[in-house]
From Swiss-Prot:
Keywords: Protease inhibitor, Secreted, Thiol protease inhibitor. It is found in: Secreted. GO terms for molecular function: cysteine-type endopeptidase inhibitor activity. The keyword Hydrolase does not apply. This is Kunitz-type proteinase inhibitor BbCI. Belongs to the protease inhibitor I3 (leguminous Kunitz-type inhibitor) family. InterPro entries: Kunitz_inhibitor_STI-like_sf, Prot_inh_Kunz-lg. The keyword NADP does not apply. Inhibits T.cruzi cruzipain. Coiled coil: none annotated. One of its GO terms (cellular component) is extracellular region.
Length: 164
């Protein structure tokens, strides 16, 4: 089914910017954080002090105007001040399979947005196959890192950046 934003409008493919608004996790928004001894912040986090947070765009190479639950997607931060804006998942101590930004985008992205309770969740499909891992939150160093986990998914609503 079609992915809808907070006003019931279909989420657009490769066009608009959206906030991911946590459903069950209090206030906060998406941000980038350093992990390990990285020079630049590349780990995607939910930061309670950063709201409404950074905005994302959903992209599928299909020539279609809207996003549905069945599409494999690239997710990227827009606008971005760096070339590293595309979400991917990589092993990162001590988080596990962390969602991080990279400057390389695969033609068909590894994520899908799927309905979950009152909102949506992101599911990571490493080989674009049938089996996916929910993107949840891993609490480390006072931050909530987005990571592919077996635990509770990060559930959010999708709010278009241009809405008041």
């Amino acid at each position: 089914s079609v992915i809808l934003d907070t006003k019931g409008e279909p989420v657009s493919n490769a066009a608009d910017a959206y906030y991911l608004v946590p459903v069950s996790h209090g206030e906060g928004g998406l941000a980038l954080a350093k992990v390990g001894n990285e020079a630049e912040p590349k780990a995607v986090v939910l930061d309670p002090h950063h709201r409404p947070g950074l905005t994302v765009r959903f992209e599928t190479p299909l020539a279609i105007a809207i996003i549905t639950e069945s599409f494999f997607l690239n997710i990227k931060f827009v606008p971005s001040s760096s070339d590293s804006e595309v979400w991917d998942v990589s092993k990162q101590y001590p988080i596990g399979l962390a969602v991080k930004v990279t400057d390389t985008k695969s033609f068909v992205g590894p994520f899908r947005v799927e309905k979950e309770g009152e909102g949506y969740k992101i599911v990571y499909y490493p080989d674009r196959g049938q089996t996916g891992l929910d993107i949840g939150l891993v609490h480390r160093n006072d931050k909530y890192y987005l990571a592919a986990t077996e635990g509770e998914p990060f559930v959010f609503k999708i709010r278009k950046a241009t809405y008041e």
